[in-house]
From Swiss-Prot:
PANTHER family: PHOSPHOADENOSINE PHOSPHOSULFATE REDUCTASE. This is Phosphoadenosine 5'-phosphosulfate reductase. GO terms for cellular component: cytoplasm. Pfam families: PAPS_reduct (PF01507). Keywords: Cytoplasm, Oxidoreductase.
Length: 243
């Protein structure tokens, strides 16, 4: 497949644009995760970036992508409310994989936000969405602009939540190509990859956490809970970056 140009794709009538992406995804569905990364690096335009929350399975995508592009910018949007274990995990993986880590934060400090707005995460869906906009979405948009990212790799998987169940390998999001190399992996494949390459889950995985974000909106998994119920009090699954 020839190098994809977003401008050319956008010039197509909507039906043809959808069909073109569907055809590409049909081919990508048949490729391994490693080959999807290779295809993306060879065929998608401009600066590639990789995002990571340094969550439970973060080591998989970080290792998978940086094996093929060691200097790819790895974007972390740091809310200032991550678990201590997460900050240590970030340090460990950054050193182990020699990551080109790029950290972006809200323009207001956590303390200033609390003084101005109170604890937004305790203010229902509207408060959580405002919190995410300030601490996740705006810093991410600034990161993409600063780094001039045109191709975005991320480690989402369909079996993580209902909101991700139908995501394609390749999509166009806000004028940027977004490629999800392990979108169709299950927990067994994640485990096998980590074992094969001497990598670890996030340290809180052993304490019963299936998904890890901020300290105030993350819960341990309990019997009967869906994975998405462990985040944001079950009110929503996404932090705004992948909606």
């Amino acid at each position: 497949m020839a190098l994809l140009e977003l401008s050319e794709l956008n010039q197509l009538p909507k039906v043809e644009r959808v069909m073109a992406l569907a055809e590409i995804n049909n081919r990508l569905d048949k490729l391994s995760a490693e080959d999807r990364v290779l295809w993306g690096l060879e065929n998608l335009p401009g600066q590639a970036v990789l995002t990571s929350s340094f969550g439970i399975q973060a080591a998989v995508s970080l290792h998978l992508v940086t094996r093929q592009k060691p200097d790819i910018p790895v974007i972390l949007t740091d809310t200032g409310y991550l678990f201590p274990e997460t900050y240590r995990f970030i340090d460990q993986l950054t050193e182990k994989l020699d990551l080109n880590l790029q950290v972006f934060r809200a323009e207001q400090s956590p303390a200033w936000q609390e003084a101005r707005y109170g604890k937004l995460w305790e203010q229902g869906v509207e408060g959580i969405e405002r919190y995410n906009q300030i601490n996740k979405v705006e810093p991410m948009n600034r990161a993409l602009e600063t780094l001039q990212g045109q191709t975005w790799f991320a480690g989402l998987r369909r079996d993580q939540s209902g909101s991700r169940a139908h995501l394609p390998v390749l999509a166009v999001k806000k004028g940027i190509f977004k490629l999800l190399p392990i979108i169709d992996w299950d927990n067994r494949q994640v485990y096998q990859y980590l074992q094969q390459h001497g990598l670890s889950y996030h340290p809180l995985w052993e304490q019963g956490y299936l998904s890890v974000g901020d300290t105030h909106t993350t819960r341990k998994w309990e019997p009967g809970m869906a994975e998405e119920e462990t985040r944001f009090f079950g009110l929503k699954r996404e932090c705004g970056l992948h909606e």
